[in-house]
Amino acid sequence: MKDMVTPQRPLRAPQDVMRLARMGVMMPTRLSFLRVLTRRLCAERAQVQRTHWDMCADGFGTAVHQVTLGGRTYALISVSKPLDDSARSDRVIATAWDAAFVLFDGVPSAADIARVATQAPRQEAGRFGPRDLVLSRANKSMRLWSEIVAALRAGHQPAPARIGEIGYIMRTTAVYGNGKFGIADRHLVADRPELSGAFAAEMLAVYLIRQFSLDLVQHVGQGTLDRALSRHIGVGNATGLGMAPFLVTHPVLLNNWMVARETALARVRAVPDIPATTRARITTLATRVAGHLSQWHVPGPEDEAALRALEAEWAAFRHHLDDLPRQDPYEHVWSCAQDHSVALQELVVALLLEVNGDIIDGLAECMVDPFGAPPQPFAGTGALRDAIGRDWGWALDIDFDDPDACRRFWYVSADKLEPRLGDRFAEDGAELETPLDIARRVAQAHADLPRTDQPVSAFLRDFPQHKHAVDRIAICARHPYAEIRDNLIATTCRPIDMLRCKLSFFGATKFDPKSDLWTRITLAQGAPLGDELTDERDDWWLPVMSV
């Protein structure tokens, strides 16, 4: 039997997709990593089991939640400790947290639990081993935590509106994987199908942390939360600059994420017709989107205004979804979306993907980078110049003599080994700059190219400082979605847009920017609970709290 080729439209151009203005409004989709992970859990009808619970009445102690996936057992070892309110901080400089976690490979022994109970609260300063897959920590959201505990102790359920407003009772401030601080290197588990996907181990840890938080609040509250309320409680996350450089330092991985997403959209746009059941599903989801937007509020006035504008724009747009043409319905919707904001366009992308899992879910297997960037030497500097002209015209258009075009510099702090941003004209340390100034480097390399063709090796012998730029040009020539096509050292660069892009691939919702440098988000809100993992439960995109 011949392999089936799924029809598709042309992919959107990288110069349109890879702009921060668009990346900064991306939405979670069914290709997001947490969603992919929960689909696998549902497909295997996995059951989360609490196999250890040693907690005092106030909720301090240790716990273990286990799940079998792909024929292997994984266990979240949780350590809950008292924390003074004055010490509760989302900042990376914090040294204590309400809870610390390790995702453990296998069934932990009593000695393993005791070791993690000692080491996990120390986080970066702890000692870990090859069976420790993920290291994390979290703080309670005391507003909602206290309200739920008080309600349960009084014998009633907490207010649904408050759960909808806040959305989580614990907020992680770091989820470390891939060998960080001595935990297991990725290659130890990368060949396991259940953990082969992008950030699969980290997403499994987040999902189990959510279950732990629900068990803990019910233990302390001495009552049982309504299932619908429990389902709407996710895991919060506070994320800052530490996440932003990842998209630059992993260009092939970024390309693969984007290509999968763009290919999914291209496939959906090529669907010639759809049945009545799918039309009804689209109408249902359009209503859900409206409800989700109406329940998404943030304190920042500019961001809140943008959300309300998107809510109004969706209300004006959705009639296109209620009255789809018989032929090429998705292409019609996509064409109509082009007259609207990029925020609405990306919301439409997510909705179109949501109703077409049968033709796009397999693309999740393409969202990893097992090989890295292969060398691709140019025939000579003429070919190098051509590649710059084809892919990097936007960088050549930037006037780097303008101080505001190169004011920022990225560096890594000595105390926490975390990315930071500096002002090269007002602060010391620019000599320690991390090479995220890709556009400037490419422009400088272009300016030094010889007029006549010569081997690239000869060019780099004379100008060794351009080696990194040449490597990036070569990567982009083969992987067109590998580069953010904006100036990352300009005063106009908003790192929050980079965070939004990456977090949308994780599956984040309810983005709540606190500045241009950090944000809070929610993960797993609406996801099935640990004893509800069945195929019928894979329907929690943009959840709405029924108040």
PLM region spans:
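Charged, amphipathic alpha-helical stretches
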Residues: 2-68
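Long, solvent-exposed non-transmembrane regions
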Residues: 5-25, 58-60, 78, 273, ...
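Intrinsically disordered, low-complexity regulatory segments enriched in Ser/Thr/Pro
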Residues: 71-130, 183-187, 197-250, 254-263, ...
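Ampiphathic alpha-helical segments that act as solvent-exposed interaction surfaces
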Residues: 30-40, 94-167, 271, 524-541, ...
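Long amphipathic alpha-helical coiled-coil/heptad-repeat bundle
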Residues: 254-282, 290-332, 338
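Short glycine-rich, low-complexity/disordered patches
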Residues: 31-39, 43-60, 127-169, 179-188, ...
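Intrinsically disordered, low-complexity segments enriched in Gly and acidic/Ser/Thr residues
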Residues: 307, 325-327, 335-514
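An N-terminal assembly and electron-transfer interface module characteristic of large anaerobic redox
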Residues: 202, 236, 257, 313-320, ...
